[in-house]
């Protein structure tokens, strides 16, 4: 999936430390550290930390 995030949280530090908390069957394409729960369907989230948030995935929000 394309690199996007609907639930991104950042610290108030400078620079900020941001992490996407979206959960889905896969992680986005730019994720380097993806963790998936052993469930069906899989529940995965990306543990990468960045200094920014990706654009939202859901264009309706």
Curated annotation (Swiss-Prot):
Give the GO molecular function terms.
serine-type endopeptidase inhibitor activity
Q: What is this protein called?
A: Bowman-Birk type proteinase inhibitor
SUPFAM superfamilies assigned: Bowman-Birk inhibitor, BBI (SSF57247)
**Family listed:** Belongs to the Bowman-Birk serine protease inhibitor family.
What are the site positions for Reactive bond for trypsin?
Answer: 12-13
Q: Which residues does this entry assign to the site Reactive bond for chymotrypsin? A: 38-39
Task: Identify one Pfam family in the record.
Answer: Bowman-Birk_leg
> Is the keyword Disulfide bond in the record?
yes
- Which cysteine pairs are joined by S-S bonds? 4-57, 5-20, 8-53, 10-18, 27-34, 31-46, 36-44
Q: Which InterPro entries match?
A: Bowman-Birk_prot_inh (IPR035995), Prot_inh_BBI (IPR000877)
Q: Which UniProt keywords apply?
A: Disulfide bond, Protease inhibitor, Serine protease inhibitor
This molecule's function is given as: Strong inhibitor of trypsin with a 1:1 stoichiometry. Weaker inhibitor of chymotrypsin.
> What does UniProt give as the signal peptide span?
none
Q: Name one GO cellular component term.
A: extracellular region
